[in-house]
Amino acid sequence: MKSKYKFLGIIIVGIIVVFILYIALNFRWHLVLKDNKVIEYKAGLVDKNIRNLTIYIPEGTTEIMDDAFSDCKSIEKVYIPESVKIIHRRAFIGCKNLKEINLPESLEKIDRDAFNGCTSLEVIRIPENVEYIGESAFSGCTDLKEISLPQSLKKIKEMTFYGCENLNNIEFPQNITDIEMGAFMGCVNLEVVKLPDTLSHIEGYVFSGCKALREVDLPNNLKYIDDATFNGCTSLSSIYLSDSVEELGYNAFGECTKLSEINIPDSISQVGAYCFEGTEWYKKLPVDSEGLKYYKHILFQATYNMEDVLVPTEITVIAGGAFMGHDELKRVVLSDRLKTIGGYAFSGCSNLYNIAIPETVRYIGSSAFSNCKSLENISIPENITHIYGNTFENCEKFQYIELPQGLEYIGKEAFKGCTLIKNTLIPKNVKQIDDGAFSMCINLENVEFEGEPLYIGNSFYDTKYYNSIKEDEYSCKYIGNHLIELVDKKREKVIIKDGTVSIANKAFSQSKIREIVFSKELKMIGESALGHCYRLEDVEFPDGLIYISKLCLIDCRNLKRVYIPKSVEDVGESILLGSGNVKEVFVSKEIAEKIDFYKNVKVRYID
C-alpha cells in the first residue's frame, strides 16, 4: 500500500517539475536557434500583452529565417549583430509596433516581404553590402519617412515600397538598371524623383498614385515607360522625354491632371491607350476636321464616330484605343508611312470591313482588331514577328489568314472565335503558340506546321482539327511532340511518349493521376498543368527541363515530394500554392529563391 502512494507521489512531483520547467521556459520570450540561424521567436507568457519589447539577436547568428518574427506585435526594437548576412522571407512581416532596427554592415540580402506591414518603422538604413532586396520587402510601411539605398543595388523589385505613405524622398543608387512593377505605388508624399542614367526601363505602376510627386528627372538612356507608370501623379506639371524614349505604355501619364508641359520626341514608336488621358496637355490638343486628335507623328484618338477615315500621311504611330468602339466605322485608309498600330486601336469596330495594313507596319498590339465582326480579310505585313493576345479575336468573317514567314510568336486567343477559318499554315520560324490561339475556330480542320514550335499548348481547343486528334494508349492527345490533354481524368498512371517537349496548360488538371513518367526531352510545363491532382504524391521532373509555369502544382493536397532538376532556368509564380503537405523539395538554390515554400518543407539544394 505504501509503495502505491510512493509511486503516486513520484508522479505528482514529476508533473509539478514539468509544469515549473514549462513556466520557466515560457515565462519570457526566447529564440529558437539552429546552425547559427534564427528559426523562430517564441513570446513568453508575460510578453504577449507588452508592446515595447527589445530583441537582441545573439552574436554569431548568420541568418534570420522565413517568418521568424512574423506578426510579433509586441516587438519595438531589434538589434542584429554584425554576423548576420541574410534576412529571409517574411522574417518581420506584420510587426506593427517595430520602430527601430539596425541592419549590420555584414548584411547581403533582404528577401521578399521581410518587413512588409511594419507600420511603425520610420527610418531604415540599408548597408552598402546589400545587393538584393526582394519583392514587397517594405510594402505597407506606412510610417517610413527615410530610407537609404546602397550603391551595390542593381534592381528595385516589384512592390518594394508600395504604400509607404510617408516616404517623401529617396536617393537612387547610380547603378540601378531596373525598377519593377509598383515599386513606389501609393507613396503619396513622395515629391521628387531623380533617376540615374543606367536605367533604361521603368515598369508599370512604379509611381502610380504618387499624388505629391511634382518633379521627375528621367534618365537620358530611358527607352520604355510602361503601363500606368505615373498614373494619378496629380502634382506633376511638366515632364521631359529624351530622344531615347521609344515606348509609352497604357495610361502611362493618365490622370496627371496638372501635366501641361511635355515634349514628344520623334523617337517614340509605340503609345498605349489613354497615355495622357485627363492631362491639361492632352485636353488642349486640337482636333482636325476629321475629328482626329494627333500631335506630330502620333494619332492619339478619333473623336468622331464616322464611316470613313483617312489617316494623315505624317502619322507613323496609331495609339492604343484610337478608334476603339467606333461601331459606325466602315472604311479606313492608313498612312503608307505607318509603323505601329497600338493595342485595342480598332477593337469593337463591328462594321469595319475595309482596311489595308501597309507593309511598313512592324508592330500590331494586343486586341488591335478584336471584335471587328465585319472584317473579311486582312493582310498581315511581312515585318510582323509577333501576333499578340486577342489581336483578331472574334473576327467572325475571316475565311483565311496568311501568316507572315518571319512570324515567331502567336499570342493567347489571337484568332479565337474566327469561326469561318478552315485552314492555316504555321510558318517555320514560329517558336511559341499560346493557349487558345485558335480556340473556338469551330470550322478549322486542317493545320500544317512548317517547323517545330517549342510550345503549342491548348491552341486549337474546340476546333474540328482538335477533335480529330486521336488519343494514345494512356488517353493523351498530342500535336506533334506536344502533350495537350489527358482526356480520361480517371487514369492513374501516364507514361509520356518519347520526344515530348511541352505539356499544355491544365493538361492533367483535376485528374486522378498518381504517377507520371516524363519524357527525357521535356523542356516546358504549362500553367496549372498538374493542378488539383489530389492523388499525386511524388513528382520528379526530368533533367533537361527548362521552364515550369505558374501554379503548375497548385492544390495538390497529398503531394509529399518534388524534384526540380538543376537544368530549370526559371519558374512562374506560386507553383506550390495550396500544396501544403509537401515535405521535401529538391531544387537548386537559385530556383528555390523564386518559390514560396510552406513552413514545414525541407528544401534540399542540389549541385
Sequence positions of predicted segments:
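N-terminal Sec-pathway targeting helices
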Residues: 1-16
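N-terminal type II signal-anchor transmembrane helix
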Residues: 12-27
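Structural signature of tandem-repeat unit edges
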Residues: 25-36, 48-63, 73-86, 96-109, ...
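Hydrophobic residues embedded in beta-strands of well-ordered beta-sheets
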Residues: 38-39, 299, 483
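Consensus positions within tandem repeat domains that build extended binding/scaffold surfaces
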Residues: 45, 65-68, 88-93, 111-116, ...
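A structural signal for leucine-rich repeat
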Residues: 576-577, 596-598
